Amino acid sequence: MITSSRNPKIVRTRKLMQRKHRQRERLFRVEGLQALHMALEAGYEPVELLYCEELFAGEGAPSLLERFRKTRAELVSVERSVMEGLSGRETPQGLVGIFPFIDVELERLALEGNELIVVLDRLQNAGNLGTLLRTADAVGAGAVIMLEPCVDLYDPGAVRGSMGSLFNLPVVRMGDPEGLFAWLKEKGFRAAGADPYEGELWHRGDWEGGTALVLGNEARGLSADVRAFIDSWVRLPMVGKAESLNVSVVGGVLMYAWSMGNPVPGECA
């Protein structure tokens, strides 16, 4: 059992809170029973799992730990004070997994052309990214594509906000808008851009079939080089005094607008 916060494993895990160390190690942290469970269900295994049984509450953590014992992950027991200092949560659940980066290339996406693709243009807030990933997963999106420079996919806030959804759908990171939209057009996807003032109201938009929903930067919206490739625009009405809506709220409403136009058999349309 590790009893010191100066142990090299603990120091390395703590450093993974910083982007430069994540990039150097190509590793990221995952906390939370749900996120770790989703990782296993999706076929991803950590290279290392730090755990503190003293912090386990209920049956979820012990049973999850037993599942991790059957993987190739290195299991490391740590003292309570060490885990509490290591955790990014107010109430640690006693498990921290260290996972390798998940690399997804655009050309390797297995899509049929009738899905929803969510394109994020230079998003900067980790919490927004996590929420959008979770919502995209919930509506059954085929992929999320992040146009760089974007917030780090593996930022602890994004990982926490996604609640494990980053393991459930492919996320592509790239910096070539022209190449992306040429690929989308070739695959039969229409690009629908979200704009606060331009285009059809959200419920009147053409959502049928393959759609790339393009969401912009929190402060500046869509960049000029991305706007040039938009096929149609959609907007949400604002009748109060608020000047804008959070991008994760806009994204959530528009993703479900697409879902209503493409209902899953057995679900409410």
Q: PLM features: residue spans?
A:
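N-terminal positively charged helical leader segments and presequences
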Residues: 1-90, 190
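Short pre-catalytic strand/loop immediately N-terminal to key active-site residues, enriched for Gly-Thr
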Residues: 26, 120-124, 235-243
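Amphipathic alpha-helical repeat scaffolds
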Residues: 32, 124-131, 245-249
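RNA substrate-binding interface of SAM-dependent RNA methyltransferases
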Residues: 41, 67-70, 76-81, 103-104, ...
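Short, ordered loop/turn segments at secondary-structure junctions
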Residues: 54, 148-151, 219
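Structured adenosyl-cofactor binding patch, chiefly the S-adenosyl-L-methionine
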Residues: 97, 135-139, 153, 157-166, ...
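Active-site/ligand-binding-proximal alpha/beta "capping" segment
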Residues: 192-242, 246
